[in-house]
């Protein structure tokens, strides 16, 4: 992120969220982390509008985010989690055909924030899923089916929560009559610049979907994953562009 101190503050909020057993406190810390990321992104967007010159660090970029090793099971659920977080932070994604990595397109500060949130939430997702499976409540559904359904529901709920926090931060930034017009213009310019960058840079073909019919369905695991997502210590788009290239084995 352009300001390492801001990224450190976001990381501190995430650590506080992970360290409390109080669900309401955890939600407050996670939402605060997302609002801080959004507010910082807005401030930088406004600053770019008024900057006479631009550096590479102030322009949209592309970054590769590693999700997992080829052949690993459940990678789609990890991709969905990252995609939901990315969408809440104005980052667009192309997904490798084997779901082992994601190309993230966005401004550096937004990709940094997305990665920090993902690093915290993916641990929580796996931990809460393991705890659910350990109870045996998913039986007779196969464990892998239950895990996939749990984690898909977790990612979808978290993405929704982060999107809400983002909208709250944007509304707060655009309510001041003195600064609202300039802020709205900066956000619109940012949206257009990111869209143009994505169109120039992306080589995606086809679409990517998190869920597959062959994976099976478990309503109980979905409900459990949704509950865990609601309680996660702080999406997703159902379809994302699929990258043409696969990660080399």
Tell where the protein language model's regions lie, with residue ranges.
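Long alpha-helical, hydrophobic tracts
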Residues: 1-62
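Extended, helix-rich structural scaffolds rather than catalytic motifs
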Residues: 3-4, 42-249
């Amino acid at each position: 992120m352009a300001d390492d101190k801001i990224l450190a503050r976001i990381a501190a909020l995430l650590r506080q969220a992970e360290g409390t057993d109080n669900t309401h406190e955890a939600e407050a810390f996670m939402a605060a982390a997302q609002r801080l990321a959004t507010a910082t992104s807005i401030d930088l967007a406004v600053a770019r509008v008024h900057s006479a010159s631009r550096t590479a660090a102030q322009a949209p970029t592309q970054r590769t985010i590693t999700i997992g090793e080829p052949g690993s099971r459940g990678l789609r659920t990890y991709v969905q989690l990252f995609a939901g977080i990315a969408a809440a932070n104005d980052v667009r994604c192309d997904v490798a055909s084997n779901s082992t990595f994601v190309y993230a397109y966005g401004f550096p500060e937004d990709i940094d924030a997305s990665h920090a949130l993902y690093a915290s939430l993916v641990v929580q997702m796996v931990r809460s899923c393991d705890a659910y499976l350990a109870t045996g409540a998913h039986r007779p559904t196969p464990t892998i089916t239950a895990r996939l359904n749990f984690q898909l529901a977790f990612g979808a709920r978290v993405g929704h929560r982060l999107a809400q926090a983002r909208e709250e931060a944007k509304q707060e930034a655009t309510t001041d009559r003195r600064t609202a017009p300039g802020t709205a213009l900066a956000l619109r310019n940012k949206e257009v610049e990111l869209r143009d960058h994505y169109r120039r840079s992306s080589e995606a073909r086809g679409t990517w979907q998190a869920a597959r019919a062959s994976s099976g369905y478990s309503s109980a695991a979905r409900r459990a994953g949704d509950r865990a997502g609601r309680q996660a210590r702080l999406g997703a788009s159902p379809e994302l562009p699929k990258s043409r290239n696969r990660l080399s084995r």
